[in-house]
Amino acid sequence: MPYSDKIIAETSKAPKSLGNLLGRWAVKLDFPVIKISDYTGATRQSIYNWFGGSEVSPAYRRSVENLLAILQSSSTAEEAMRKCNKSK
């Protein structure tokens, strides 16, 4: 399911941070928030907050960094999902 125009606009305007970079790549690849939640263990609300520039708490930092690397090395959401499944 594509991201809403509101989420896309908020993500593109927010200061670049770890969570915001995750959001920018998720939007670019249309990688679902529920999959980010599954991978990181964070709530969907937390993830949307990260997209908007909120700080990623230390408990989630490593999984967010790992997922960001997966998204950055993928050309499609499907490819990223396959890589996520292999890395778990």
Residue ranges, per PLM feature:
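Short alpha-helical "recognition helix" segments of helix-turn-helix
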Residues: K35-S37
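Residues in the recognition helix of alpha-helical DNA-binding motifs
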Residues: W25, Y39, W50
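A short, Lys/Arg-rich alpha-helix, primarily the initiator
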Residues: P2-L29
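DNA major-groove recognition helix of helix-turn-helix/homeodomain DNA-binding modules
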Residues: P58-E78
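Recognition helix of helix-turn-helix/homeodomain-like DNA-binding domains
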Residues: A42-V56
